[in-house]
Amino acid sequence: MQFSISRENLLKPLQQVCGVLSNRPNIPVLNNVLLQIEDYRLTITGTDLEVELSSQTQLSSSSENGTFTIPAKKFLDICRTLSDDSEITVTFEQDRALVQSGRSRFTLATQPAEEYPNLTDWQSEVDFELPQNTLRRLIEATQFSMANQDARYFLNGMKFETEGNLLRTVATDGHRLAVCTISLEQELQNHSVILPRKGVLELVRLLETNDEPARLQIGTNNLRVHLKNTVFTSKLIDGRFPDYRRVLPRNATKIVEGNWEMLKQAFARASILSNERARSVRLSLKENQLKITASNTEHEEAEEIVDVNYNGEELEVGFNVTYILDVLNALKCNQVRMCLTDAFSSCLIENCEDSSCEYVIMPMRL
């Protein structure tokens, strides 16, 4: 069995697929990628048993259809180091793969293709399409609030929720919450799942910034996304996500509105002298003025005064400045609204002109 392919056609899909592989898999065959040759098309598949990625590309020639495995990292390193215009020929004989290009020749050990695991076929409960850039924006707007290696395993991921014609992503680590909602062109049944953190990071890496379609299939145990030449599949977290609606403050009495760029720069400067561990800053509000102060264990201090629209009572409250900057970097807008109730309440932050994304940050003790 033999096929030929240009380096240009092979490198990108191979890199994408190798990205989902584990560095130390429990099963030796998972060090490999699966190669499926059919009608001059090559499908490359990789998995770590949690996330699976398949990517298709065009062959220059093939002697017959077939399915084989090849060591992923070694094959990728060989392809990466060949010259840009290289033509690569791969020949499979028994338990060996011969990779040739010009005067270069490599013999690699393979594993039986039938031993390669795959996430079995499953029935999707929700199936719809949306532009890739829309899905990417949904994920990027909320992913920074995901927990990382939290004992509450259901927080180590992102909630995907369909409700009528709405698609929503939600992420929280217990200290902050991010919710982003978009409208779809079709009505869907109400359904929600939790995509693991690794699945979220791999998926957003695949999504383009154009309006090419992405087809989402959401099942009970898996989520699958079909892109142009790529199919992404991830297992889901079996757990109950917190009721985020109870966290969103709806009766805030103290409303602050200010310029996004000015606030972002002020918080960024104040953060330089904030405590390295706590990362706390003090927000002091009075009529049409926000004062941001920070200090650290070396008794160094920073103070920033920003003009804002505020007509409530004077108020002092503390927040983690990293959390605030994460929100501001995600918003990228003209005017920002901050909604508070008192010095002990959470703060809701949103774009003044677009409430599709909402962010909640818990206060810190001053």
Swiss-Prot record:
Keywords: Cytoplasm, DNA replication, DNA-binding, DNA-directed DNA polymerase, Nucleotidyltransferase, Transferase. It comes from the Bacteria. It is found in: Cytoplasm. One of its GO terms (biological process) is DNA strand elongation involved in DNA replication. InterPro entries: DNA_clamp_sf, DNA_polIII_beta, DNA_polIII_beta_C, DNA_polIII_beta_cen, DNA_polIII_beta_N. GO terms for molecular function: 3'-5' exonuclease activity; DNA binding; DNA-directed DNA polymerase activity. CDD domains: beta_clamp. GO terms for cellular component: cytoplasm; DNA polymerase III complex. Belongs to the beta sliding clamp family. Confers DNA tethering and processivity to DNA polymerases and other proteins. Acts as a clamp, forming a ring around DNA (a reaction catalyzed by the clamp-loading complex) which diffuses in an ATP-independent manner freely and bidirectionally along dsDNA. Initially characterized for its ability to contact the catalytic subunit of DNA polymerase III (Pol III), a complex, multichain enzyme responsible for most of the replicative synthesis in bacteria; Pol III exhibits 3'-5' exonuclease proofreading activity. Forms a ring-shaped head-to-tail homodimer around DNA which binds and tethers DNA polymerases and other proteins to the DNA. The DNA replisome complex has a single clamp-loading complex (3 tau and 1 each of delta, delta', psi and chi subunits) which binds 3 Pol III cores (1 core on the leading strand and 2 on the lagging strand) each with a beta sliding clamp dimer. Additional proteins in the replisome are other copies of gamma, psi and chi, Ssb, DNA helicase and RNA primase. NCBIfam families: dnan (TIGR00663). This is Beta sliding clamp. It comes from Haemophilus influenzae (strain ATCC 51907 / DSM 11121 / KW20 / Rd). The gene is dnaN.
